[in-house]
Amino acid sequence: MTHWFHRNPLKATAPVSFNLYGVASSPAANKICNDLRTARARLLDMFTDATCSPDTLKKSSDEYFALLQGFILPLDGTTQENKLRFIQNFKWTDTLQGNIASAQQDAVFELVSMAFNVALWYTKFASRLAGKENITEEEAKDVHKSLKIAAGIFKTLKETHIPRLITPAEKGRDLEPRVIDTYIVQSQAEAQEVTIARAIELKHNASLIAALAFETANFYQKADHTLNTLDPECSSKWKKYLQLKQHFYMAYAHCYHGQTLLAGDKCGEAIRSLQEAEKCYSRAEVLCKEYRQMKGPGSTAKPSEQLFFKKLGAVIKNTLEKCQRENGFIYFHKVPAEAPALELKASYGLAEPTAFELPPLSAQCTPEVYATFDLTRGHKDDKAKAKPEEEIKPVKEPDLKPQKDTGCVVC
Protein backbone atom coordinates (compact mmCIF):
# COMPACT_ATOMS: atom_id res chain seq x y z
CA MET A 1 0.00 0.00 0.00
CA THR A 2 2.65 2.49 -1.09
CA HIS A 3 1.40 6.09 -1.02
CA TRP A 4 -1.57 5.32 1.26
CA PHE A 5 -0.54 7.85 3.91
CA HIS A 6 0.19 11.58 3.55
CA ARG A 7 3.47 12.56 5.18
CA ASN A 8 4.74 16.07 5.88
CA PRO A 9 8.52 16.62 5.63
CA LEU A 10 10.93 16.07 8.46
CA LYS A 11 12.11 19.09 10.41
CA ALA A 12 15.56 20.32 9.34
CA THR A 13 18.14 21.78 11.69
CA ALA A 14 21.43 23.63 11.62
CA PRO A 15 24.55 21.86 12.95
CA VAL A 16 25.32 22.34 16.64
CA SER A 17 28.93 22.07 17.80
CA PHE A 18 28.45 22.22 21.59
CA ASN A 19 31.90 23.84 21.70
CA LEU A 20 31.65 25.54 25.08
CA TYR A 21 35.18 26.87 25.02
CA GLY A 22 36.15 28.27 28.39
CA VAL A 23 32.91 27.22 30.05
CA ALA A 24 33.65 23.48 29.96
CA SER A 25 36.68 23.62 32.23
CA SER A 26 37.35 19.92 32.84
CA PRO A 27 38.04 16.87 30.63
CA ALA A 28 34.74 15.30 31.78
CA ALA A 29 32.79 18.45 30.84
CA ASN A 30 34.49 18.57 27.44
CA LYS A 31 33.68 14.90 26.89
CA ILE A 32 29.97 15.57 27.51
CA CYS A 33 30.06 18.34 24.89
CA ASN A 34 31.88 16.13 22.38
CA ASP A 35 29.51 13.23 23.02
CA LEU A 36 26.50 15.52 22.59
CA ARG A 37 27.78 16.68 19.21
CA THR A 38 28.46 13.12 18.07
CA ALA A 39 25.16 11.71 19.38
CA ARG A 40 23.17 14.52 17.74
CA ALA A 41 24.84 14.02 14.36
CA ARG A 42 24.32 10.25 14.57
CA LEU A 43 20.62 10.64 15.39
CA LEU A 44 20.07 13.08 12.53
CA ASP A 45 21.67 10.57 10.15
CA MET A 46 19.26 7.88 11.38
CA PHE A 47 16.26 9.93 10.24
CA THR A 48 17.28 9.59 6.58
CA ASP A 49 18.63 6.03 6.69
CA ALA A 50 16.06 3.79 4.98
CA THR A 51 17.55 0.73 6.72
CA CYS A 52 17.18 2.16 10.24
CA SER A 53 14.99 0.06 12.55
CA PRO A 54 12.88 1.29 15.49
CA ASP A 55 15.27 -0.39 17.94
CA THR A 56 18.28 1.34 16.38
CA LEU A 57 16.54 4.71 16.37
CA LYS A 58 15.43 4.34 19.99
CA LYS A 59 18.96 3.47 21.10
CA SER A 60 20.35 6.49 19.27
CA SER A 61 17.67 8.90 20.51
CA ASP A 62 18.00 7.63 24.10
CA GLU A 63 21.75 8.26 24.01
CA TYR A 64 21.23 11.84 22.88
CA PHE A 65 18.34 12.67 25.20
CA ALA A 66 20.17 11.15 28.19
CA LEU A 67 23.05 13.57 27.60
CA LEU A 68 20.88 16.54 26.66
CA GLN A 69 19.04 16.32 29.96
CA GLY A 70 22.33 17.30 31.59
CA PHE A 71 21.54 20.76 30.18
CA ILE A 72 17.93 20.71 31.44
CA LEU A 73 17.53 18.90 34.77
CA PRO A 74 18.71 20.54 38.03
CA LEU A 75 22.07 18.99 38.95
CA ASP A 76 23.21 21.16 41.84
CA GLY A 77 20.86 19.81 44.50
CA THR A 78 18.45 22.74 44.17
CA THR A 79 15.23 23.34 42.26
CA GLN A 80 16.76 26.22 40.32
CA GLU A 81 16.99 26.19 36.52
CA ASN A 82 19.97 24.30 35.09
CA LYS A 83 22.64 26.92 34.38
CA LEU A 84 23.41 25.30 31.00
CA ARG A 85 19.85 25.38 29.67
CA PHE A 86 20.20 28.71 27.85
CA ILE A 87 23.86 28.55 26.80
CA GLN A 88 23.50 26.98 23.33
CA ASN A 89 21.50 28.22 20.34
CA PHE A 90 19.36 25.78 18.31
CA LYS A 91 17.70 26.27 14.93
CA TRP A 92 14.88 24.15 13.51
CA THR A 93 12.50 24.41 10.58
CA ASP A 94 8.82 23.45 10.83
CA THR A 95 6.99 20.83 8.80
CA LEU A 96 4.53 23.32 7.26
CA GLN A 97 6.72 26.43 6.95
CA GLY A 98 9.37 25.58 4.36
CA ASN A 99 13.04 26.29 4.99
CA ILE A 100 12.70 29.29 7.31
CA ALA A 101 13.99 28.27 10.73
CA SER A 102 12.95 29.18 14.23
CA ALA A 103 15.81 29.76 16.66
CA GLN A 104 15.82 29.56 20.44
CA GLN A 105 18.72 29.53 22.89
CA ASP A 106 17.07 26.87 25.02
CA ALA A 107 17.89 23.17 25.50
CA VAL A 108 14.18 22.42 26.04
CA PHE A 109 13.49 23.76 22.53
CA GLU A 110 16.11 21.33 21.23
CA LEU A 111 14.55 18.47 23.20
CA VAL A 112 11.02 19.00 21.91
CA SER A 113 12.16 19.67 18.32
CA MET A 114 14.33 16.56 18.14
CA ALA A 115 11.67 14.40 19.82
CA PHE A 116 9.11 15.78 17.35
CA ASN A 117 11.34 14.52 14.53
CA VAL A 118 11.60 11.14 16.25
CA ALA A 119 7.79 10.93 16.24
CA LEU A 120 7.70 11.94 12.56
CA TRP A 121 10.23 9.19 11.83
CA TYR A 122 7.93 6.59 13.39
CA THR A 123 5.05 7.73 11.16
CA LYS A 124 7.29 7.53 8.09
CA PHE A 125 8.62 4.13 9.10
CA ALA A 126 5.03 2.91 9.44
CA SER A 127 4.21 4.28 6.00
CA ARG A 128 7.22 2.58 4.38
CA LEU A 129 6.46 -0.72 6.09
CA ALA A 130 2.79 -0.59 5.09
CA GLY A 131 3.99 -0.09 1.51
CA LYS A 132 5.81 -3.41 1.38
CA GLU A 133 4.61 -6.15 -0.93
CA ASN A 134 3.04 -9.09 0.94
CA ILE A 135 3.35 -7.51 4.38
CA THR A 136 3.38 -10.08 7.18
CA GLU A 137 1.27 -10.10 10.33
CA GLU A 138 4.30 -9.14 12.44
CA GLU A 139 5.05 -6.22 10.13
CA ALA A 140 1.43 -5.10 10.40
CA LYS A 141 1.82 -5.12 14.17
CA ASP A 142 4.95 -2.98 13.78
CA VAL A 143 3.00 -0.45 11.70
CA HIS A 144 0.32 -0.31 14.38
CA LYS A 145 2.89 -0.06 17.18
CA SER A 146 4.90 2.67 15.44
CA LEU A 147 1.87 4.88 14.90
CA LYS A 148 0.85 4.56 18.55
CA ILE A 149 4.41 5.39 19.64
CA ALA A 150 4.33 8.50 17.43
CA ALA A 151 1.01 9.58 18.91
CA GLY A 152 2.43 9.08 22.41
CA ILE A 153 5.51 11.19 21.71
CA PHE A 154 3.46 14.04 20.24
CA LYS A 155 1.05 13.87 23.20
CA THR A 156 3.79 13.91 25.84
CA LEU A 157 5.56 16.82 24.16
CA LYS A 158 2.33 18.81 24.12
CA GLU A 159 1.36 18.07 27.71
CA THR A 160 4.72 17.98 29.49
CA HIS A 161 7.61 19.57 27.62
CA ILE A 162 6.29 22.32 25.32
CA PRO A 163 4.68 24.21 28.26
CA ARG A 164 8.20 24.59 29.70
CA LEU A 165 9.38 26.74 26.78
CA ILE A 166 10.12 30.35 27.71
CA THR A 167 9.28 31.53 24.19
CA PRO A 168 5.86 30.21 23.08
CA ALA A 169 5.49 28.65 19.65
CA GLU A 170 4.49 31.00 16.84
CA LYS A 171 1.26 30.42 14.93
CA GLY A 172 1.53 27.69 12.34
CA ARG A 173 4.71 26.25 13.84
CA ASP A 174 4.97 22.59 14.79
CA LEU A 175 4.93 23.17 18.55
CA GLU A 176 1.69 25.17 18.66
CA PRO A 177 -1.45 23.29 19.80
CA ARG A 178 -3.36 23.12 16.51
CA VAL A 179 -0.50 21.52 14.61
CA ILE A 180 0.65 19.04 17.25
CA ASP A 181 -2.97 18.09 18.08
CA THR A 182 -3.48 17.20 14.42
CA TYR A 183 -0.41 14.99 14.42
CA ILE A 184 -1.65 13.20 17.55
CA VAL A 185 -5.11 12.50 16.14
CA GLN A 186 -3.85 11.55 12.67
CA SER A 187 -1.43 9.02 14.17
CA GLN A 188 -4.24 7.47 16.21
CA ALA A 189 -6.57 7.35 13.20
CA GLU A 190 -3.95 5.66 11.03
CA ALA A 191 -3.26 3.10 13.76
CA GLN A 192 -6.97 2.29 13.77
CA GLU A 193 -6.82 1.78 10.01
CA VAL A 194 -4.52 -1.15 10.76
CA THR A 195 -7.12 -2.58 13.13
CA ILE A 196 -9.91 -2.16 10.58
CA ALA A 197 -7.90 -3.88 7.84
CA ARG A 198 -7.15 -6.73 10.24
CA ALA A 199 -10.81 -7.05 11.26
CA ILE A 200 -11.89 -7.20 7.62
CA GLU A 201 -9.21 -9.77 6.78
CA LEU A 202 -10.35 -12.03 9.62
CA LYS A 203 -14.04 -11.47 8.78
CA HIS A 204 -14.94 -10.06 12.19
CA ASN A 205 -18.49 -9.02 13.04
CA ALA A 206 -19.78 -6.31 10.70
CA SER A 207 -20.97 -4.23 13.66
CA LEU A 208 -17.43 -4.13 15.09
CA ILE A 209 -15.97 -3.03 11.74
CA ALA A 210 -18.67 -0.38 11.33
CA ALA A 211 -18.02 1.02 14.81
CA LEU A 212 -14.24 1.12 14.28
CA ALA A 213 -14.66 2.79 10.89
CA PHE A 214 -17.04 5.37 12.38
CA GLU A 215 -14.61 6.18 15.21
CA THR A 216 -11.76 6.47 12.70
CA ALA A 217 -13.76 8.78 10.43
CA ASN A 218 -14.50 10.96 13.46
CA PHE A 219 -10.79 11.11 14.27
CA TYR A 220 -10.04 12.34 10.76
CA GLN A 221 -12.85 14.90 10.98
CA LYS A 222 -11.48 16.14 14.31
CA ALA A 223 -7.99 16.49 12.82
CA ASP A 224 -9.38 18.37 9.82
CA HIS A 225 -11.35 20.79 12.00
CA THR A 226 -8.29 21.40 14.19
CA LEU A 227 -6.53 22.91 11.15
CA ASN A 228 -9.46 25.16 10.17
CA THR A 229 -7.88 28.36 11.48
CA LEU A 230 -4.42 27.65 10.10
CA ASP A 231 -3.11 29.48 7.03
CA PRO A 232 -4.61 27.62 4.01
CA GLU A 233 -1.39 28.08 2.05
CA CYS A 234 0.44 25.64 4.31
CA SER A 235 -2.43 23.45 5.52
CA SER A 236 -4.88 22.98 2.60
CA LYS A 237 -3.19 19.88 1.17
CA TRP A 238 -2.98 18.23 4.58
CA LYS A 239 -6.63 19.09 5.28
CA LYS A 240 -7.72 17.59 1.96
CA TYR A 241 -6.02 14.31 2.88
CA LEU A 242 -7.79 14.26 6.25
CA GLN A 243 -11.13 14.95 4.53
CA LEU A 244 -10.74 12.17 1.97
CA LYS A 245 -9.86 9.71 4.72
CA GLN A 246 -12.87 10.86 6.75
CA HIS A 247 -15.29 10.23 3.87
CA PHE A 248 -13.60 6.93 2.99
CA TYR A 249 -14.11 5.56 6.50
CA MET A 250 -17.62 6.98 6.73
CA ALA A 251 -18.32 4.95 3.60
CA TYR A 252 -16.91 1.90 5.41
CA ALA A 253 -19.05 2.62 8.47
CA HIS A 254 -22.29 2.94 6.48
CA CYS A 255 -21.43 -0.12 4.37
CA TYR A 256 -20.85 -2.44 7.32
CA HIS A 257 -23.68 -0.90 9.31
CA GLY A 258 -25.88 -1.78 6.34
CA GLN A 259 -24.72 -5.39 6.59
CA THR A 260 -25.61 -5.37 10.30
CA LEU A 261 -29.07 -3.98 9.55
CA LEU A 262 -29.68 -6.62 6.87
CA ALA A 263 -28.67 -9.36 9.31
CA GLY A 264 -31.28 -7.91 11.69
CA ASP A 265 -33.99 -8.08 8.99
CA LYS A 266 -34.07 -4.29 8.55
CA CYS A 267 -33.67 -4.38 4.81
CA GLY A 268 -35.10 -0.94 4.02
CA GLU A 269 -32.73 0.73 6.46
CA ALA A 270 -29.88 -1.42 5.14
CA ILE A 271 -30.53 -0.17 1.60
CA ARG A 272 -30.53 3.44 2.78
CA SER A 273 -27.30 2.88 4.71
CA LEU A 274 -25.64 1.40 1.63
CA GLN A 275 -26.85 4.33 -0.47
CA GLU A 276 -25.20 6.65 2.04
CA ALA A 277 -22.03 4.56 1.77
CA GLU A 278 -22.10 5.08 -2.01
CA LYS A 279 -22.46 8.82 -1.50
CA CYS A 280 -19.51 8.98 0.94
CA TYR A 281 -17.37 6.81 -1.33
CA SER A 282 -18.07 9.02 -4.34
CA ARG A 283 -17.16 12.08 -2.29
CA ALA A 284 -13.90 10.38 -1.24
CA GLU A 285 -13.07 9.75 -4.91
CA VAL A 286 -13.59 13.44 -5.73
CA LEU A 287 -11.48 14.50 -2.76
CA CYS A 288 -8.69 12.15 -3.89
CA LYS A 289 -8.53 13.93 -7.26
CA GLU A 290 -8.56 17.35 -5.60
CA TYR A 291 -5.83 16.28 -3.19
CA ARG A 292 -3.59 15.04 -6.00
CA GLN A 293 -3.81 18.44 -7.70
CA MET A 294 -3.02 20.49 -4.61
CA LYS A 295 0.33 22.06 -3.88
CA GLY A 296 1.73 22.24 -0.38
CA PRO A 297 4.12 20.61 2.07
CA GLY A 298 4.48 16.86 2.20
CA SER A 299 4.41 13.77 0.03
CA THR A 300 1.35 13.10 -2.11
CA ALA A 301 -0.59 9.98 -1.18
CA LYS A 302 -2.47 8.10 -3.90
CA PRO A 303 -5.21 6.23 -2.02
CA SER A 304 -7.70 6.06 -4.89
CA GLU A 305 -5.19 3.96 -6.89
CA GLN A 306 -4.96 1.31 -4.18
CA LEU A 307 -6.87 -1.97 -4.29
CA PHE A 308 -7.91 -1.42 -0.68
CA PHE A 309 -9.72 1.72 -1.81
CA LYS A 310 -11.20 0.15 -4.94
CA LYS A 311 -12.34 -2.98 -3.09
CA LEU A 312 -14.61 -0.91 -0.87
CA GLY A 313 -16.40 0.45 -3.92
CA ALA A 314 -17.07 -3.11 -5.09
CA VAL A 315 -18.21 -4.23 -1.63
CA ILE A 316 -20.68 -1.34 -1.40
CA LYS A 317 -22.05 -2.04 -4.89
CA ASN A 318 -22.45 -5.78 -4.33
CA THR A 319 -23.97 -5.41 -0.86
CA LEU A 320 -26.45 -2.79 -2.05
CA GLU A 321 -27.52 -5.00 -4.96
CA LYS A 322 -27.97 -7.93 -2.56
CA CYS A 323 -30.12 -5.81 -0.22
CA GLN A 324 -32.27 -4.60 -3.11
CA ARG A 325 -32.78 -8.17 -4.35
CA GLU A 326 -33.72 -9.39 -0.87
CA ASN A 327 -36.10 -6.48 -0.42
CA GLY A 328 -37.79 -7.26 -3.74
CA PHE A 329 -38.26 -10.95 -2.91
CA ILE A 330 -38.68 -11.13 0.86
CA TYR A 331 -38.95 -7.95 2.91
CA PHE A 332 -40.73 -5.30 0.79
CA HIS A 333 -39.59 -2.65 3.26
CA LYS A 334 -39.89 1.05 2.53
CA VAL A 335 -36.50 2.72 2.14
CA PRO A 336 -36.28 5.66 4.59
CA ALA A 337 -35.56 9.15 3.29
CA GLU A 338 -32.87 9.70 5.90
CA ALA A 339 -29.87 7.44 6.40
CA PRO A 340 -29.87 5.49 9.69
CA ALA A 341 -27.93 7.35 12.35
CA LEU A 342 -24.52 5.92 13.14
CA GLU A 343 -24.72 5.83 16.91
CA LEU A 344 -21.81 3.45 17.09
CA LYS A 345 -19.23 3.11 19.82
CA ALA A 346 -16.31 0.74 19.39
CA SER A 347 -15.65 -1.43 22.43
CA TYR A 348 -12.46 -2.93 21.01
CA GLY A 349 -9.61 -1.90 18.74
CA LEU A 350 -9.32 1.80 19.58
CA ALA A 351 -5.72 3.01 19.37
CA GLU A 352 -4.45 4.76 22.47
CA PRO A 353 -1.12 6.64 22.31
CA THR A 354 1.78 4.70 23.81
CA ALA A 355 3.18 6.52 26.83
CA PHE A 356 6.52 8.18 26.07
CA GLU A 357 9.24 8.60 28.67
CA LEU A 358 12.65 10.15 28.33
CA PRO A 359 15.62 7.94 29.23
CA PRO A 360 17.35 8.41 32.58
CA LEU A 361 19.98 11.12 32.85
CA SER A 362 23.36 10.00 31.48
CA ALA A 363 25.76 8.69 34.11
CA GLN A 364 28.30 11.20 32.75
CA CYS A 365 26.18 14.12 34.01
CA THR A 366 27.07 14.17 37.69
CA PRO A 367 26.89 17.14 40.09
CA GLU A 368 30.69 17.07 40.26
CA VAL A 369 31.07 17.42 36.48
CA TYR A 370 28.25 19.97 36.37
CA ALA A 371 30.22 22.15 38.80
CA THR A 372 33.11 22.31 36.30
CA PHE A 373 30.96 24.18 33.76
CA ASP A 374 31.96 27.75 34.63
CA LEU A 375 29.63 30.37 33.14
CA THR A 376 31.69 33.22 34.58
CA ARG A 377 34.37 32.47 32.01
CA GLY A 378 31.95 33.44 29.26
CA HIS A 379 30.90 31.63 26.10
CA LYS A 380 30.44 32.61 22.50
CA ASP A 381 29.01 30.37 19.83
CA ASP A 382 31.66 29.41 17.33
CA LYS A 383 29.41 31.15 14.83
CA ALA A 384 27.27 34.22 15.26
CA LYS A 385 23.90 33.66 16.89
CA ALA A 386 21.34 32.56 14.30
CA LYS A 387 18.85 34.96 12.86
CA PRO A 388 15.25 33.73 13.30
CA GLU A 389 14.60 33.99 9.55
CA GLU A 390 17.67 32.04 8.44
CA GLU A 391 17.00 29.40 5.78
CA ILE A 392 18.08 25.83 6.42
CA LYS A 393 18.52 23.22 3.72
CA PRO A 394 15.63 20.69 3.80
CA VAL A 395 16.22 17.09 4.83
CA LYS A 396 16.75 14.77 1.86
CA GLU A 397 14.49 11.85 2.67
CA PRO A 398 14.73 8.38 1.10
CA ASP A 399 12.48 7.83 -1.91
CA LEU A 400 9.39 5.72 -1.35
CA LYS A 401 9.56 3.29 -4.26
CA PRO A 402 6.20 1.93 -5.42
CA GLN A 403 5.71 -1.79 -5.01
CA LYS A 404 3.10 -4.12 -6.35
CA ASP A 405 -0.17 -3.47 -4.53
CA THR A 406 -1.61 -6.60 -2.98
CA GLY A 407 -4.78 -4.81 -1.94
CA CYS A 408 -4.11 -5.28 1.75
CA VAL A 409 -2.98 -2.22 3.64
CA VAL A 410 -1.46 -3.75 6.71
CA CYS A 411 -2.61 -7.29 7.15
Swiss-Prot record:
Q: Where is the composition biased (Basic and acidic residues)?
A: 379-404
Task: Show the SMART domains listed in the entry.
Answer: BRO1
The source's domain of life comes to: Eukaryota
Question: In the UniProt record, does the keyword Heme occur?
Answer: no
Against Gene3D superfamilies, the record matches this protein to: alix/aip1 like domains (1.25.40.280)
Please list the residues that carry the modification Cysteine methyl ester.
408
Q: What compartments host this protein?
A: Membrane
CC per GO annotation: membrane
Residues of the signal peptide: none
Ranges for domain BRO1: 84-403
Region spans: Disordered: 379-411
Which stretches of the sequence are propeptide? Answer: 409-411
Q: How does it sit in the membrane?
A: Lipid-anchor
Q: Where is the lipid attached (S-farnesyl cysteine)?
A: 408
Keywords linked to the UniProt accession: Lipoprotein, Membrane, Methylation, Prenylation
Here the disulfide bonds are none
Q: Which Pfam families match?
A: BRO1
- Record family assignment: Belongs to the BROX family.
Q: What is this protein called?
A: BRO1 domain-containing protein BROX
Organism whose genome encodes this protein: Danio rerio (Zebrafish)
As recorded in Swiss-Prot or TrEMBL, the protein's gene is named: brox
